[in-house]
């Protein structure tokens, strides 16, 4: 006993490939696949030999009881072929690709212009802020310069006043020294001792007479002066 089953199947697949650059070189591929299947089965009648009944257990024994002996089967054979067909893009697809490129270019220009406007705004804001800060710094420097001038003026005036006071003090001390020297000289003059020697000689007929004396005068004077 034999059986044969032949099955033929044809499959057609189309695929469109678009280049990433978006240009008009669009390719269309057509793939045709043919499948052929073949199955062959041959069965031989089993030979019957009388034998005592035997009970088979397990999967192998059960399969042998169901199928019996002499069963063979051939595997399926599959074959196929592939064919590629290159097609040129249509006018509509070319126009669509051109419009896509134009839209991409316009959007890119719009992004660049928007970024340029934002940078101009930021630059202008930064310039105004920098000018305001520079004006503040200039005014602070002017104030600092005025403070420096005032400080130098105060320092010079303070130095002049100190020198004047030192000169006045030195003159006062010199005057007091002169006053003390004059006072000492005056006191020395007043305390000087006056000495007088007197000697008298008297000659007469009766005889010779000598008379003498010494006078010492001391004067002390104290003067208190209040300033």
Swiss-Prot record:
Residues 1-15, 24-35, 95-126 have a biased composition (Basic and acidic residues). It comes from Hypsibius exemplaris (Freshwater tardigrade). At high concentrations, the monomers successively form oligomers, long fibers and eventually a gel-like matrix in a strongly temperature-dependent manner. It may be that under adverse environmental conditions, such as low temperatures, the gel-like intracellular matrix can sequester soluble proteins in their native state, maintaining their functional form until environmental conditions become more favourable. Residues 91-191 form a coiled coil. It is found in: Cytoplasm. Residues 126-144 are annotated as: CAHS motif 1. Residues 163-181 are annotated as: CAHS motif 2. The gene is CAHS 94063. The keyword Repeat applies. Residues 205-219 have a biased composition (Low complexity). Residues 95-194 are annotated as: Helical. GO terms for biological process: response to desiccation. This is Cytosolic-abundant heat soluble protein 94063.
């Amino acid at each position: 006993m034999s059986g044969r089953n032949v099955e033929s199947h044809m499959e057609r697949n189309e695929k469109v490939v678009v280049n990433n650059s978006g240009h008009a070189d669009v390719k269309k591929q057509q793939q045709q696949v043919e499948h052929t299947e073949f199955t062959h089965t041959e069965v031989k009648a089993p030979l019957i030999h009388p034998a005592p009944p035997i009970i088979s257990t397990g999967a192998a024994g059960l399969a042998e009881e169901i199928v019996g002996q002499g069963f063979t089967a051939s595997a399926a054979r599959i074959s196929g072929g592939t064919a590629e067909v290159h097609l040129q893009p249509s006018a509509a697809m070319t126009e669509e690709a051109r419009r896509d490129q134009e839209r991409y270019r316009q959007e890119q220009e719009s992004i660049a212009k928007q970024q340029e406007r934002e940078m101009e705004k930021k630059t202008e804001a930064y310039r105004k802020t920098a000018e305001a800060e520079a004006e503040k710094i200039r005014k602070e420097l002017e104030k600092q310069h005025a403070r420096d001038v005032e400080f130098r003026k105060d320092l010079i005036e303070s130095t002049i006043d100190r020198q004047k006071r030192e000169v006045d003090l030195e003159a006062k001390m010199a005057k007091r020294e002169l006053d003390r020297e004059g006072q000492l000289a005056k006191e020395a003059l007043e305390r000087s001792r006056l000495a007088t020697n007197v000697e008298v000689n008297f000659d007469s007929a009766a005889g010779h007479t000598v008379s003498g004396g010494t006078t010492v005068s001391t004067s002390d004077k104290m003067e208190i002066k209040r300033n």
